[in-house]
Amino acid sequence: VAQFYAEHNEKPFFADLAAFMTSDVVVGMELVAPDAVQKWRQVIGPTNTATARAEAPSSVRASFGTDQTKNAVHGADSLGSYKREAGFWFGGEDPAARPMQTTAVLDNCTLCLIKPHIQREGKTGQVIDAILAAGFEISAMELFNLTRPVIEEFYEVYKGVLPEYLPLIENMSNCPVVALEGRQANAGASFR
C-alpha cells in the first residue's frame, strides 16, 4: 500500500487509507477505451463522496462511497499514474512475474468460466451476482484470452461426446473469458 499510494505517505489520512485498503480483498481492473483515464474519472466522480453526491449524483462514488477513504473505487488521475499503477497491479505478461499473487484457495471450490457471449451482452455482473446469491464466495477471478489449442485441450473430454463441441470451441477461442474460483462446501456438486 505504501508503494502504491506513495504520494500520500506523509498525509494525515494515510494510516486510515492503508488500514482500509489492507482490510480485505481488493479487485483490480484495467479498463480500456479511448481516453479511458478521463472517462473513468467522470464515471467515478470526485474523491470526496459528499462532493460527489452534490456535483455528480449518479457517479460511482456518490452511489457507493461512504467517506473520503471508503469512496468505493480508485482511478488513476493521469496517463502517467495509470502506467505506474497498472504495472504495480498487473506487471507483465508472465503471471509469475506479477507483483500481486493469486487469491485462489484451491479448497472446497469449483471453476466457473463466464463465456464470451455473456460479456458481449453486458451480463457478466449479473452472472457474478447470481453466483454470490447462491451462497458462493468468489475467491479468485481473472480475465484470459484463450487460444484454440488451450480451449481444445480444456474441453478434450467432450470431443465426440458433446454435439455442440465445435461451436463451443469456436465461441471460446481467442475471446476474453472470465475464470473464477467459487467456494462453498461441496462446491462442485452444488454449483451445477
Predicted segment positions?
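Non-catalytic terminal and connector segments of soluble metabolic enzymes
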Residues: 1-192
